[in-house]
Amino acid sequence: MRAVTRNKIVNNLYFSTFLIAFASVAIGSVLPCPAHSVDSDSPAVQQHKLQLAHEQELKRKDALSKKI
């Protein structure tokens, strides 16, 4: 193989590797992750929602007891 041909092949290999690496990082930044987010599945979020519901229930009961 001649040196010029070998040089072109190596340059094309490096260039294609760079493009693939750049594209894989760029695609990860553009497309959203299909997995569930960590916050939506965490027990802290569920506990906070339950606490808010409990507080609303207490306020509702307190408002009803004041009417009576």
Swiss-Prot record:
GO terms for cellular component: mitochondrial inner membrane; mitochondrial matrix. The keyword Magnesium does not apply. It is a peripheral membrane protein. It is found in: Mitochondrion inner membrane. Keywords: Membrane, Mitochondrion, Mitochondrion inner membrane. GO terms for biological process: mitochondrial cytochrome c oxidase assembly. Transmembrane segments: none annotated. Pfam families: COA2. The keyword Ligase does not apply. Belongs to the COA2 family. Required for efficient assembly of cytochrome c oxidase in the mitochondrial inner membrane. Seems to be involved in the SHY1-mediated step of cytochrome c oxidase maturation. May aid in stabilizing an early COX1 intermediate containing the nuclear subunits COX5A and COX6. This is Cytochrome c oxidase assembly factor 2.
